[in-house]
Regions:
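Short, well-structured beta-strand/strand-turn elements
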Residues: 40-43, 325-339, 400-405
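Substrate-binding/catalytic subdomain of NAD(P)-dependent oxidoreductase enzymes
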Residues: 201-241
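A glycine-rich dinucleotide-binding beta-alpha-beta segment and adjacent secondary-structure elements
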Residues: 326-380
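N-terminal helix-loop segment corresponding to the beta1-alpha1 unit
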Residues: 2-207, 242, 385, 391-413
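Glycine-rich beta-alpha junction loops
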Residues: 47, 141-142, 218-223, 260, ...
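A short glycine-threonine-serine/GTX helix/turn-capping micro-motif
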Residues: 178-189, 211-213, 243-247, 251-253, ...
Length: 413
């Protein structure tokens, strides 16, 4: 299989990935692998493609200012890939996927349990033709259990996995009640766990020569990510509650209203609290037994926080930020998304990059946060148009122009 030559020197530039996934969790992992240099082929349905292509507005606009078929959602998770359209319901389409999988290192899929087995595209089949293949299935609930065959989306898994029970304002305050996180955090975490799992399997394959089958369930990821809140319950026997912006285990950490805006204060230890008290003109607080230790501050936050709230209202946000930064006390303004991209640190780290796009001219992308000293991540390929690379990929597995044209006429690609 003649996968496209890469100019990038990413650490995975020798790896070939077949990405049969759609929506976000699987594609996010595929994008992580592509950012690391892997050649990722994204298999999509003819004429329709990944569901997220239509999840808008907003949509990317072409050079004439007209909306394209690429939504902002789709563009967030498919950078660096090549798109191939294949109808998996046909024998010819299944043959194409088997040919691609035979030469791939990793296969990602997130179909409902048992679906790909009906097409002869399951791990048991591929293991016979490519023993080194690492095949990863990403589903809502994993491959077994009473909910294994159920469909799932990020929002419902945030609810089922307990995240919404500890996210949002306290129930007895205005705006209280269950709240989801502002980005699809379960999908993103699932994508990251998927990436870690397949890379671990690659490392093991280097020793054994054998691939593996990996089963990732979104609910498992959510339960495995409730971290301190899960252990808070297991240690205390008490169900954690929503605390708004207040940290359940560390104080003071909260959003404080200033004279002209808001600031986030994150005091992580007793030394930082003492520094805050100097800035706030309250040098006696660190010696007060109610506030001397973090445990005391957590127990007495009902006393401490109202006094702090009154102090913050006395000065503008910029004054607080300048003084706290100078004292080494962690704090931050609450940026809007546009303000994030204008932040001096974000600009210095070059977190935005414009990539060439066949219809829009260029498309902005948020680059990977991973930085290496012995490898370079080059961002060269925009999220692909639907089927943009079908011809070149099929030519790479021996399909001639006549056969490709016939498959196109038949609607198979």
């Amino acid at each position: 299989l003649n996968f496209q030559e890469h100019t990038m020197a990413g650490p995975l530039s020798h790896i070939k990935v077949l990405d049969l996934s759609r929506i976000l969790a699987g594609p996010w992992s595929g994008q992580v692998l592509a950012d690391l240099g892997a050649d990722v082929i994204k298999v999509e349905r003819p004429k329709v493609g990944d569901d997220t292509r239509s999840w808008g507005p907003p949509f990317l606009k072409d050079a004439d200012g007209k909306e394209t078929r690429e939504s902002g959602y789709y563009l967030s998770a498919n950078r660096g890939k090549r798109s191939v359209t294949v109808d998996l319901n046909t024998a010819e389409g299944q043959e194409i996927v088997r040919a691609l999988a035979a030469k791939s290192d990793i296969l990602l899929e997130n179909y409902k349990v048992g679906t790909l087995a009906k097409f002869g595209l399951d791990y048991a089949t591929f293991k016979e033709i490519n023993p080194g293949l690492i095949y990863c299935s990403v589903t809502g609930f994993g491959q077994d259990g009473p909910k294994a065959e159920n469909a799932a989306y990020d929002f419902m898994i945030q609810a089922m996995g307990g995240l919404m029970s500890v996210t949002g304002e306290m129930d007895d305050l205005p705006g209280g009640g269950p709240q989801k996180v502002g980005v699809p955090i379960v999908d993103l975490m699932t994508g990251m766990y998927t990436s870690v799992a397949v890379l671990a399997a690659l490392a093991r394959r280097a020793e054994t020569g054998l691939g593996d089958y990996i089963d990732i369930g979104m609910l498992d990821v959510m339960v495995g990510s409730i971290a301190n809140q899960g252990m808070n319950y297991l240690v205390s026997g008490k169900s954690p509650k929503r605390n708004g912006n207040k940290h359940p285990n560390i104080q003071p950490q909260d959003v404080f209203a200033c004279a002209d805006g808001h600031i986030v204060l994150v005091v992580g230890n007793d030394g930082q609290f003492a520094k805050f008290c100097e800035v706030a003109g309250q040098p006696e607080w660190p010696a007060d037994e109610r506030f001397a230790t973090n445990g005391a501050r957590v127990r007495n936050r009902g006393v401490l926080l109202p006094m702090m709230e009154a102090l913050f209202l006395e000065r503008p946000m910029a004054d607080w930020a300048t003084a706290l930064d100078a004292a080494g006390v962690p704090c931050s303004p609450i940026n809007t998304i546009p303000q994030v991209f204008e932040d001096a640190q974000v600009k210095h780290r070059k977190m935005l990059v414009d990539l060439p796009h066949p219809t829009a001219g260029t498309v902005p992308q948020i680059r990977s946060p991973m930085r290496f000293t012995q490898a370079e991540l080059l961002f060269e390929r925009a999220p692909p148009l639907l089927g943009q690379h079908t011809g070149e990929v099929l030519a790479g597995i021996g399909y001639d122009e006549q056969r490709i044209a016939q498959l196109t006429r038949d609607g198979i690609i």
